[in-house]
C-alpha cells in the first residue's frame, strides 16, 4: 500500500492523503457474506445518545469476518483482497476445498492464490491459524483469542502485531502492540503475521466533510456549552473552566485518571502494563 497525495486545488484538498488501494483486487463483495448494517447514530433502544459524535455518513453493509479460523486441516485459497468500510484493515476472501467461502483479516504479505490452513499441524506461514501452544517463541502474530473458541479479539487493526515471548505451563506470554505483556491460555488460537494496510495511520483526512462521510460528527468544546450541559460551561464570554483540571461531561477527570477496575480478575494475567 502506498499513500496517495493530492494537489492543493482547494483548501480541503491541501494536505489530504488517501490509500492508493493498489492491494485491492475487486470492488464487488461476496453477496453471501454480507449483512445489513443499521446506522443507529449512537442511540440506544430508548433513542438516547450513548455514544457521542456518531451519525450520518455513507450507507454500509457488514462483511461477516471469520475470526475463529476453526476449520482444521481444510486448505483454503485466497481469491480476492477487498476493502472493508467497517475496519481499518483490508479483508481477504478465501475459498475452502469443501466449498465454503469466508472473509478473514488480510495480513501483511498475503496475496491472491496463496493457500492457507488452520489447525495444530499447520505450517508457520503468513495467514495460517494455530493454537498458541504450537507457535514458536518469537513469532509475530495477530487476531488472538482471549478465550478458546470465542474468536480473535486482540490485534485486529491495520498495521498491528504481537509477539510470542515464552511459554509457562498452560499459558503463553504475549507482548501486545501497546507494549503490555500478558498471559493467554495456550489453547487459544492466533494467526501468523501482522495485520496489513500498515500505512493506514499516515492518512490525513484533510477536511471536515470527509469525516462526515465516515459517520463522525463534530465535537463541541465543553467551555462553550451551558452549565447544565457540561461542567466547563457557563460564565460571561470566554471564561476559564473554573477547575484545577478538565473533566468529562459527567465529571470524570479527563487527564491522567485511571479508569481500569482495580479489582479486575484479569490483573493476574498481566505481567507488565502497557508502555504507551
UniProtKB/Swiss-Prot annotation:
Biased composition (Polar residues): 37-48
Keyword Cell inner membrane: no
Alphabetical GO biological process terms: cytoplasmic translation
GO MF terms, alphabetically ordered: rRNA binding; structural constituent of ribosome; transferase activity
Keywords: Ribonucleoprotein, Ribosomal protein, RNA-binding, rRNA-binding
Alphabetized Pfam families for the sequence: Ribosomal_L2, Ribosomal_L2_C
GO cellular component: large ribosomal subunit
UniProt keyword Flavoprotein, yes or no: no
Region (Disordered) location: 34-55, 221-276
Domain of life according to the entry: Bacteria
Family: Belongs to the universal ribosomal protein uL2 family.
Known function: One of the primary rRNA binding proteins. Required for association of the 30S and 50S subunits to form the 70S ribosome, for tRNA binding and peptide bond formation. It has been suggested to have peptidyltransferase activity; this is somewhat controversial. Makes several contacts with the 16S rRNA in the 70S ribosome.
Quaternary state and interactors: Part of the 50S ribosomal subunit. Forms a bridge to the 30S subunit in the 70S ribosome.
HAMAP family according to UniProt: Ribosomal_uL2_B
Protein name: Large ribosomal subunit protein uL2
Organism: Enterococcus faecalis (strain ATCC 700802 / V583)
Protein's gene: rplB
Amino acid at each position: 500500500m502506498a499513500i496517495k497525495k493530492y494537489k492543493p486545488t482547494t483548501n480541503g484538498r491541501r494536505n489530504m492523503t488517501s490509500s492508493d488501494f493498489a492491494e485491492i483486487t475487486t470492488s464487488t463483495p461476496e453477496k453471501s457474506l454480507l449483512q445489513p448494517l443499521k446506522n443507529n447514530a449512537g442511540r440506544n433502544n430508548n433513542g438516547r445518545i450513548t455514544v457521542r459524535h456518531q451519525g450520518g455518513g455513507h450507507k454500509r453493509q457488514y462483511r461477516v469476518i471469520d475470526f475463529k479460523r476453526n476449520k482444521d486441516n481444510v486448505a483454503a485459497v485466497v481469491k480476492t483482497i477487498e476493502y472493508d468500510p467497517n475496519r481499518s484493515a483490508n479483508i481477504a476472501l478465501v475459498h475452502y476445498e469443501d466449498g465454503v467461502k469466508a472473509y478473514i483479516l488480510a495480513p501483511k504479505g498475503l496475496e491472491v492464490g496463496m493457500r492457507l490452513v488452520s489447525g495444530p499441524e499447520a505450517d508457520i506461514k503468513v495467514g495460517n491459524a494455530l493454537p498458541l501452544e504450537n507457535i514458536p517463541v518469537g513469532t509475530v502474530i495477530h487476531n488472538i483469542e482471549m478465550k478458546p473458541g470465542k474468536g480473535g479479539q486482540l490485534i485486529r487493526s491495520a498495521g498491528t502485531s504481537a509477539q510470542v515471548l515464552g511459554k509457562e505451563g498452560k499459558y503463553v506470554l504475549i507482548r501486545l502492540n501497546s507494549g503490555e505483556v500478558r498471559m493467554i491460555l495456550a489453547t487459544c488460537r492466533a494467526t501468523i503475521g501482522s495485520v496489513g494496510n500498515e500505512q493506514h495511520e499516515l492518512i490525513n483526512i484533510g477536511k471536515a466533510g470527509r469525516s462526515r462521510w465516515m459517520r463522525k460528527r463534530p465535537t463541541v468544546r465543553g467551555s462553550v456549552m451551558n452549565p447544565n450541559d457540561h461542567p466547563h460551561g457557563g460564565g460571561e464570554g470566554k471564561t476559564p473552566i473554573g477547575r484545577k483540571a478538565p473533566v468529562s461531561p459527567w465529571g470524570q477527570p479527563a487527564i491522567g485518571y485511571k479508569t481500569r477496575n482495580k479489582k479486575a480478575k484479569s490483573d493476574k494475567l498481566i505481567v507488565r502494563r502497557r508502555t504507551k
